[in-house]
Amino acid sequence: MAFGLDTGVENVVRIKVIGVGGGGNNVVNRMVRSGTRGVDFVAVNTDKQALNVSSATYKIQIGEKLTHGQGAGSDPEVGRKSAEESRAQISKALEDTDMVFITAGMGGGTGTGGAPIVAEIAREQGILTVGVVTKPFGFEGRRRMQQAEKGIEELQGKVDSLVIIPNERLKHATDQKITFANAFEIADDVLRQAVQSISDLIRDTGFINLDFADVTAIMKNAGMAHMGVGRAAGKGKA
């Protein structure tokens, strides 16, 4: 009896990564630049200028009537209403999708308010929905943290699995000195790693190969998930 590795996954599982708001859009741009394959990218924003420079294949300007393309002004309620206004566009972008990653930097307006609506629409369409979000750095202030926590609580009820990356802990997970100038760049890259590591497990054929049924069984209605960030250097690094 012969045993073989399943190489047909890439042609079957349709994965989309949707970046909502500034932080989410940054993750999408990083994944595109890193050459991530087999995934469709969608950028969702209230800020028209941010969408103009996005590397995503699909771009959705939400809340055009409400915000006139000028952003949500760090107000999650504006982000929520903008996503509600554009439900039809979001739903259209999610057609023919098996799994979606919704990524956002929580604490601002568009990502915090819009991500739960995007997740709600995805779940309504029967899509396996995974949220991957960051919590703010301490220096971003109490108000932003409170908004993030409220947004995360709302998002948790709309997704199958939710990965939360507390930016403040990145100080202990990187050799780089975190400064105000590079803090968000490092946070965006960790967010990218989180999304890419899960999608690669499904996409890549190797010694460990998860088929989509395995992933669905693990992540469907799983609630909170945890992610570790590791570093390796030198000969034989893993």
Regions found by a protein language model. Give the residues of each.
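Tubulin/FtsZ superfamily GTPase core signature
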Residues: 1-238
